[in-house]
From Swiss-Prot:
This is Photosystem I assembly protein Ycf3. Belongs to the Ycf3 family. Essential for the assembly of the photosystem I (PSI) complex. May act as a chaperone-like factor to guide the assembly of the PSI subunits. GO terms for cellular component: chloroplast thylakoid membrane. Keywords: Chloroplast, Membrane, Photosynthesis, Plastid, Repeat, Thylakoid, TPR repeat. PROSITE patterns: TPR (PS50005), TPR_REGION (PS50293). PANTHER family: CELLULOSE SYNTHASE OPERON PROTEIN C (PTHR44943), TPR REPEAT-CONTAINING PROTEIN MJ0263 (PTHR44943:SF8). TPR repeats lie at residues 35-68, 72-105, 120-153. GO terms for biological process: photosynthesis. It is found in: Plastid, Chloroplast thylakoid membrane. InterPro entries: PSI_Ycf3_assembly, TPR-like_helical_dom_sf, TPR_rpt, Ycf3/AcsC/BcsC/TPR_MFPF.
Length: 168
């Protein structure tokens, strides 16, 4: 049974009904409808913390989805789950793949920067200042890209860039 039929709260049910109506009246291919259904079910599972189910739905959504923009959000959400699971290398891979299809995802750049910053902090704790500096430099580059796409957002990152003298 599709997840959209088992959601318990009123807002989820209402959103599912509206989405189903839109799927019927907007001219889309069966592949696009299938991809959207899997994507919607993946988002629902992800919001409830059911990451394995969400991943399964997102992977299924990538099969029929051919639109690069829509596919970028599926890949981005897969990256989010891998980040939440502490699988940073996999997360970075999916953020990169999302950005290949849609280079205007500041949140992907931000999340990549957060992972790099975290790895830099780990290197500091391990006493490897050279590796820490490399990770921090990479974090700075990603944050600059996120800020360039959405000036006024990512204020903490902007402040970190200024404090560490990485902002130009």
């Amino acid at each position: 049974m599709p997840r959209s039929r088992i959601n318990g709260n009123f807002i989820d049910k209402t959103s599912s009904i509206v989405a189903n109506i839109l799927l019927r009246i907007i001219p889309t291919t069966s592949g696009e409808k299938e991809a959207f259904t899997y994507y919607r079910d993946g988002m629902s599972a992800q919001s409830e913390g059911n990451y394995a189910e969400a991943l399964q739905n997102y992977y299924e959504a990538t099969r029929p989805e051919i639109d690069p923009y829509d596919r970028s959000y599926i890949l981005y959400n897969i990256g989010l789950i891998h980040t939440s699971n502490g699988e940073h290398t996999k997360a970075l891979e999916y953020y990169f793949r999302a950005l290949e299809r849609n280079p205007f995802l500041p949140q992907a750049f931000n999340n990549m920067a957060v992972i790099c910053h975290y790895r830099g902090e780990q290197a500091i704790r391990q006493g490897d200042s050279e590796i820490a500096e490399a990770w921090s430099d990479q974090a700075a580059e990603y944050w600059k890209q996120a800020i360039a796409l959405t000036p006024g957002n990512y204020i903490e990152a902007h402040n970190w860039l200024k404090i560490t003298r990485r902002f130009e």
